[in-house]
Amino acid sequence: MVKYSRDPSNPTKSAKACGKDLRVHFKNTRETAFALRRMPLGKAKRYLEDVLAHKQAIPFRRYCRGVGRTAQVKNRQPNGQGRWPAKSAQFVLDLLKNAESNAEVKGLDVDNLYISHIQVNQAQKQRRRTYRAHGRINPYMSNPCHIELILSEKEEPVKKEADNVVAPRKAI
């Protein structure tokens, strides 16, 4: 059994999925996941498919040094920095589909699901080496990541009963 960093508030109305040691850049995947927080499942899948087709960009907020600007991010972030991380989008999309099928097996309403928790952690770096001039050797590292997400059904709030307001009596 895999340990998640957070338990769902209602385990019977949620589905989980995670990927460990995924060979995809941590920084790009973190920005992709951050853009999907609290998004409905259908909207998130459409958004990632648009990213793969370069119709919408992922806004880069934390790891944004040297990232160019694009008009596709203007309404989502003040400085308009964004990219189209295809591999990260594909990995997260596959994980969303996995969680969706887990929800179907549990008997949840797929149209009513939203991403209640998504988190990306750094995995152990994979070391390689590159050979430089004058007999030197430099490290050539890759930065894989762990992704976990929880889909939950939206809870409809209990409707408040109408208050019967009693008019105050007039003093005689």
From Swiss-Prot:
Top-rank taxon, per record: Eukaryota
Keyword tRNA processing included in the entry's annotation: no
GO biological process: cytoplasmic translation
Sorted UniProt keywords: Ribonucleoprotein, Ribosomal protein
SUPFAM superfamilies membership: Ribosomal protein L22
A GO MF term: structural constituent of ribosome
UniProt xrefs under Pfam families: Ribosomal_L22
Any one annotated GO CC term: cytosolic large ribosomal subunit
Family recorded in the similarity comment: Belongs to the universal ribosomal protein uL22 family.
NCBIfam families: PRK04223.1, uL22_arch_euk
Protein name: Large ribosomal subunit protein uL22y
Species: Hordeum vulgare
